[in-house]
């Protein structure tokens, strides 16, 4: 019985030590790091910097990237990068304006999710096009002290209600 009691106390003691040694997460610092990734995402598009854009995404093979065009579905950053390289080749100017940015973080500081509304202005072959209110949502994950996008979805709202409710 003494052995069980000592074993119990030992387990309790080591459990307490391991729990109390956990470092406290500075959520404001994590928030700033996530915002930096999102800022780089925007900056990469404006500068047509494919390397910077790819650095915003996770290297994991099971990420999800959904664009506004019907065929824009990628499950890895390499194939998205190939398509984006072609797109950058056709754009003379890319300008983004972000508003209504919302960012949430898990209390453990390892997962973040966001929403932002983005206005896109592009020039191609002397022709300007503007796409207002592109809704962009996504999830970032912190792995090896680096935040990266693991899921992103962009959509264009339609005018009016498709179905009245």
What are these regions (language model features)?
Residues 1-27:
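Bacterial Sec-dependent N-terminal signal peptides
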Residues 19-56, 165:
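Short, low-complexity N-terminal intrinsically disordered segments enriched in polar/charged residues
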Residues 50-107, 131:
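A solvent-exposed, acidic/Ser-Thr-rich amphipathic alpha-helical stretch
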Residues 57, 118-120, 153-154:
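Short beta-strand segments enriched in hydrophobic/aromatic residues
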Residues 90, 120-130:
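Short, cysteine-centered beta-strand-loop-beta hairpins and adjacent loop/turn segments enriched
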Residues 98-104, 118-120, 135-141:
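Hydrophobic/aromatic beta-strand elements that line small-molecule binding cavities or substrate pockets
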Residues 110-120:
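A short hydrophobic beta-strand element
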Residues 113, 132-163:
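Short beta-strand edge/turn micro-motifs at domain boundaries
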């Amino acid at each position: 019985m003494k052995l069980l009691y000592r074993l119990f106390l030992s387990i309790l003691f080591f459990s307490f030590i391991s729990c109390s040694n956990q470092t406290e997460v500075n959520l404001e610092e994590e928030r700033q790091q996530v915002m930096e990734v999102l800022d780089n995402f925007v900056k990469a598009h404006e500068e047509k910097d494919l390397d910077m854009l790819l650095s915003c995404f996770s290297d994991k093979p099971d990420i999800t990237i959904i664009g506004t065009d019907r065929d824009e579905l990628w499950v890895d950053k390499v194939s998205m990068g190939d398509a984006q390289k072609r797109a950058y080749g056709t754009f003379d100017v890319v300008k983004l304006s972000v508003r209504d940015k919302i960012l949430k973080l898990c209390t453990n500081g390892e997962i973040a999710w966001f929403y932002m509304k983005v206005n896109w202005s592009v020039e191609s072959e002397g022709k300007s096009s503007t796409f207002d209110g592109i809704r962009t949502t996504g999830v970032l994950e912190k792995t090896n002290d680096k935040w990266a996008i693991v899921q992103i979805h962009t959509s264009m709202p339609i005018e009016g209600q498709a179905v009245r409710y």
